[in-house]
Amino acid sequence: PYEKIGAELVKEVAKKTDDVAGDGTTTATVLAQALVREGLRNVAAGANPLGLKRGIEKAVEKITETLLKSAKEVETKDQIAATAGISAGDQTIGDLIAEAMDKVGNEGVITVEESNTFGL
């Protein structure tokens, strides 16, 4: 029964990550799996489940705070190109994304579709 609960939890983490961020589902799944595994191991060894939950919540709060402090706004076309290039693993794609974002502006929408035509 615990395995099913853990699997459902990991599935929910991946879905929520995809819904909110659109990326990072693999990382979220690996982290969730480790949390479930270690949590169950600690409970089996006698740890208080509520204490573990509170500890995890405090850790999430601190990590979120630290990430937000170190986050940087991406505003210029060059910054967008660099960030998108890293994310895509290809600077040419990063440049195309930056160009598209420059054309549509902050409130614009960019739709990406699969194509059989190379380079478009």
From Swiss-Prot:
Its EC number is 5.6.1.7. Pfam families: Cpn60_TCP1 (PF00118). GO terms for cellular component: cytoplasm. Keywords: ATP-binding, Chaperone, Cytoplasm, Isomerase, Nucleotide-binding, Stress response. GO terms for biological process: protein refolding. It comes from the Bacteria. ATP binds at D23, G24, T25, T26, T27. It is found in: Cytoplasm. It catalyses: ATP + H2O + a folded polypeptide = ADP + phosphate + an unfolded polypeptide. One of its GO terms (molecular function) is isomerase activity. Belongs to the chaperonin (HSP60) family. Forms a cylinder of 14 subunits composed of two heptameric rings stacked back-to-back. Interacts with the co-chaperonin GroES. Together with its co-chaperonin GroES, plays an essential role in assisting protein folding. The GroEL-GroES system forms a nano-cage that allows encapsulation of the non-native substrate proteins and provides a physical environment optimized to promote and accelerate protein folding. This is Chaperonin GroEL. It comes from Mycolicibacterium rhodesiae. The gene is groEL.
